[in-house]
Regions:
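Membrane-proximal interfacial segments on either side of biological membranes
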Residues: 1-180, 184-286
Length: 286
């Protein structure tokens, strides 16, 4: 309902997703104040220029305890996002890119992670996420993530680069990161539309100093400047917490036997999969 008199002047009230909302036009059609009541969601839109073909403006808001801010350009075919900032106690990032609206929804973003609390990963519910297969198959996305450790940070990872491609439910990830000058690379792919998605992976570790790397994990090792090269291929079922190793190679002198692969499988599942799939992201368990 729209009110244009009294203390509710220039106010629109209604209901969406079972929650009441209120929009205040601020006596100016270029400024909109939106609140979804009893949810902690509030958005303020400021349009600096708009016509039938293009809208330019910025957005500020709060989603629960998180603050967001961004400039944008909308022209019916796409939304160009500039200087997007997300700030929250456990997660902060900056992002820029384009969201294509026609003929299909496609998201292309470059995102720099400023801060991430690993505890957030423990709260990920993959099973609930995979229940939205009808939505997942309609999303096409190309997203680049980057992270660089700040000075005096306690983060184990020095830097991280990740490319994520999602198209028609098929997810491909290229990931590389460094820990104490040792380089990790991992490529993976999976079909999220399958009843039990299986992730195929091919991962490599290249280290020129095994001692320096292990020290990051509080593991003592005697010899300096000893190289460590590991290649691991396999697949894992992200809902059943099961993994199968196709091959494991260490340096030039070790190739895992069938019995070794079975041992690594059981050890991996008992330690890293003790609760759920996301435990593989907790480096302290390695």
């Amino acid at each position: 309902s729209f009110s244009n008199y009294g203390y509710k002047q220039n106010t629109i009230e209604g209901e969406v997703f079972g929650k009441e909302f209120k929009i205040n036009l601020k006596n100016n059609p270029k400024k909109i104040d939106f609140k979804l009541l009893e949810t902690g969601i509030s958005i303020f839109l400021n349009f600096s220029d708009y016509n039938r073909n293009k809208t330019i403006g910025n957005i500020k808001g709060k989603i629960l305890k998180a603050k967001i801010k961004s400039d944008f350009i909308y022209d019916q075919e796409l939304i160009r996002i500039k200087k997007f900032y997300f700030r929250e106690k456990n997660l902060s990032f900056n992002s820029e890119g384009i969201i294509l609206l026609n003929p299909f929804l496609e998201i292309n973003l470059e995102t720099q992670i400023v801060h991430l609390n690993n505890k957030l990963l423990k709260n990920i519910n993959l099973e609930s996420f995979l229940n939205f297969k009808n939505i997942i198959k309609k999303i096409n996305s190309n997203t680049d993530f980057s992270f660089k450790q700040k000075k005096f940070s306690r983060s184990i990872i020095d830097n991280l680069n990740m490319k994520i491609n999602l198209a028609y439910g098929r997810l491909n990830i290229e990931k590389s990161f460094e820990i104490s000058e040792s380089e990790f690379k991992c490529n993976s792919e999976t079909n999220l539309l399958e009843e039990y998605p299986v992730v195929s992976f091919d991962c490599n570790l290249l280290s020129q100093d095994k001692k320096k790397l292990l020290k990051k994990f509080d593991i003592k090792y005697k010899f300096k400047d000893e190289p460590l090269n590991i290649n691991v291929k396999g697949n894992l079922n992200i809902l059943n917490n099961k993994i199968n190793f196709e091959s494991i190679k260490i340096n030039q002198d070790y190739i895992a036997t069938k019995e070794d692969l079975s041992f690594f499988k059981n050890t991996f599942e008992n330690i890293l999969f003790k609760q759920n799939f996301v435990n593989i992201f907790i480096l302290s368990k390695i």
